Regions:
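Alpha-helical segment of the N-proximal tetratricopeptide repeat
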Residues: 40-84
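Long, contiguous interaction/recruitment modules in multidomain scaffold/adaptor proteins
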Residues: 1-46, 105
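TPR alpha-solenoid repeat register
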Residues: 91, 125-126, 132, 175, ...
């Protein structure tokens, strides 16, 4: 066997060894990434649960001072959950709810915008997406004041969200009532009446404030 053939065989064996070692390393690397992802997800879930518990206590507490303190602690836990898993929309929604409870509506809107934007929104079920859209519409309407372009913009944004809610959840009576209120603000009396009638079929108590 000549020197050239020996050299070719040596190179072939070396190449095969490199491929073998590389293929063996792939599962190990994948496992390492999966382990890191699972740790991040577990940590995010832990902070999310703590935050949800704090927000629940904030809503139930009779003392305004304690309630706000608990809501701010819920925001802090939500931030930790977001840092651990930025791709999960749930902590962003929790943060928005806690901020809204604390009276910080514009930051709450920004958190909901982030939760409802891709790719984060992919983690939401249709019902969760509908809930988040409904909350965003509620905040938009709570911020409505005065007249002019700003009023029109917020009402239009709320209408868009509420129409999306009803696509995901057609029997959501609260969304129908809010949509009717938006139509009234736009001066669309007949459309508002139609939506209120639909809401009445779902739950008459939802439109008791609209009577008269």
């Amino acid at each position: 066997m000549g020197a050239t053939e020996l050299a070719v065989q040596a190179l072939t064996l070396a190449f095969a060894l490199i491929i073998f070692l590389y293929l063996r390393s792939i599962p190990r690397q994948a496992l390492s990434r999966l382990r890191h992802l699972r740790q991040s997800t577990t940590e995010s879930h832990r902070h999310f649960v703590r935050g949800a518990q704090l927000l629940s206590r904030a809503r139930a507490h009779s003392s305004p001072y304690t309630s706000l303190a608990l809501a701010r602690s819920a925001v802090a836990e939500a931030d930790l959950a977001i840092a651990a898993d930025p791709r999960d929309a749930a902590p962003l929604i929790l943060k928005a709810l806690a901020l809204d409870h604390d009276g910080h509506r514009l930051p709450a809107l920004r958190a909901l915008d982030a939760a409802l934007s891709p790719p984060t929104s992919k983690s939401l079920s249709d019902r969760d997406r509908a809930d988040a859209l409904l909350k965003r519409a509620e905040i938009q309407l709570a911020l409505v004041g005065g007249r002019g372009r700003q009023l029109k913009r917020r009402v239009d944004l709320a209408i868009g969200d509420l129409e999306d809610v009803l696509r995901f959840w057609p029997e959501n009576g609260k969304a129908k009532v809010l949509l009717g209120e938006c139509y009234e603000k736009k001066g669309w009396k007949e459309e508002a009446k139609g939506v209120f009638m639909e809401a009445l079929k779902v739950d008459g108590s939802l439109i008791s404030t609209q009577e008269g």
